[in-house]
Amino acid sequence: MIRRTLVGASADPVAAYPVKTGALVKTIVLCSGGLDSVTLAHKVAAESTLTRLVSFDYRQRHNKELEYARRCATRLTAPHDVVDIAAVGRLLTGSALTSGGAVPEGHYAEETMRVTVVPNRNAIMLAIAFGVAAAERADAVAAAVHGGDHFIYPDCRPAFVEAFETMQRHALDGVARISFSTPFLRMSKADIVREGARLEVPFAETWSCYKGGALHCGRCGTCVERREAFHLAGVDDPTPYEDPDYWVEACRKHRARQLS
C-alpha cells in the first residue's frame, strides 16, 4: 500500500490523504546498483508501474555500482538517470566512501563502520528524486532503506523516513502528490534476499562492496552483511568474494562482543 498526498494548497498538508495501490502507482526508484535497491526495482516493476530509476554519482569510491544500476534498468526496460552530484560529494568529507580513508573491515553493525556515513546523503538524493517525481507527475519515490541500516545510518531510520515524508508534503503542497515508499524499512537484509529470490532477481548482477575492486572483497561491512544475509535466508549466494569465509569470524566476534 502506498499513500498519496492531496493536491491543492491547504492549511495542513500533513493531514490524512487518499490511498493509491497496486499497478496504478507510478513510482521512481532510487537505485544504487546494490542488492537492496535492485531488489526494490524488481518489486516495483512487478507490483506497480516503474517509471524511472535514478542513481547518483557523488564521487563514491565504489562507483562501479552504477554499472549494475544501468544493467537493472536495461533488464526492466526502464529509463535510467545518473545524476552527477560530484561537486557536492567533494564537500562531504570525512567519510571513508568519499575521502581517502580506509574502508573498515568487520561486522556491519560495529561502531567502526560509522566512518562510512556520508553526511545527509539520503536527504540530498531524495530531495532531488522527489523533485523529479513532481516534474513527471509520478505518484511515489521508493527507497530501499532497511532494518539492517538503522544502527549506523541515521538517514535510514523510521524517524527520518517519517520526517522526510512530512517535509515533502509541505515542500510540494499544492504542487504534486508524492508519497515515500519504503517497503523494506523494518525488514532485515535476509528478508530482502528472500524477497529477491521470490522475484527471481539476478543477485550476481548487483554490487555491494564499498572497496570497489574487481571482486567483492568479502571483508568490508557491506560484504559481511551480504554474505550473512544469504546464509540466514537459506539462499545460494552467487557472489565471488576475494575472501569468502571472513564473514563467519566477523559475525562470531560481533556476537561475542554483544554478550560480553
Language-model features, listed with the residues they occupy:
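A polyampholytic, Gly/Pro-enriched intrinsically disordered region
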Residues: 104, 201, 228-231
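Short, charged low-complexity linear segments at domain edges
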Residues: 184-210, 248-255
